[in-house]
Amino acid sequence: ALNSFTCQSQQNMITPPYLQKGDTVAILATARKNIDDNLKPTLDLLHSWGLEAVIGSTIGLDLNQLAGTDEQRAADFQKQLDNPNIKAIWCVRGGYGTVRMIDLLDFTKFKQHPKWVIGFSDVTVLHNHLNTMGYKSIHGAMPVSIPRATPDAISSLKKSLFGEPLSYSVGPDKMNRFGSATGELVGGNLSILYSLLGSQSAIDCKDKILFIEDLDEYLYHID
């Protein structure tokens, strides 16, 4: 039998305004460079949803494995964070580097005009930091993965952004456990989660539902 669960709004967290047709989404890089990535499928997708797109200054920057210096990536993110006309920030890809710029960011204007931050993998740094501040964010597909994203991944992202009800079905597995639970969903990439322990961006998992994603992670790294 399939396990299923439904995502509902948590009243104790701050929800950024859901998107409406005509809103603008900023696409930028907080971590790895994306020199060879084709953003056309992502732009076409946003336009099909009735949304506009702004390309950040970090798209195309190349500094070793990173999309520019820590200061360049932080400045690009800060610009979109402070712009009230930007309703969502979509991180183009993961990799490594977001943790190097998180302490350079000022969320003062974000608190005045909250917006959605979207991504997975290395973007877990931002999700966790926002969670400590009491804000919701979206762990979802990124522009670099859109060409190979499943229909379910695309659909759930759209529903999350536009405030539509979400539900998931999980296939049978011997590790599944049946039951009921209600709580705030936290987590993200495992290697990022343990790297943030002891920092101001570390999440409190007590009485919450912990979600973990990763691959090729060794047990001794988290022992």
Give each language-model segment a name.
Residues 36, 98-99, 126-127, 194, ...:
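Short, well-ordered alpha-helical microsegments
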Residues 1-11:
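Bacterial Sec-dependent signal peptides at the C-terminal "C-region" and cleavage site
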Residues 66-176, 180-184:
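Active-site histidine-anchored catalytic micro-motif
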Residues 9-85:
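ATP/NTP phosphate-donor binding region
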Residues 154-223:
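ATP/pyrophosphate-binding catalytic subdomain of soluble kinases
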Residues 21-22, 114, 207:
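Phosphate-coordination loops involved in phosphoryl transfer and adenosine-cofactor binding
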Residues 31-34, 143-147, 215-217:
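Short histidine/acidic/glycine/proline-rich micro-motifs that form metal-
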Residues 26-29, 87-91, 210-213:
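Short glycine-rich or small-residue beta-strand-to-loop segments that form or flank ligand, phosphate
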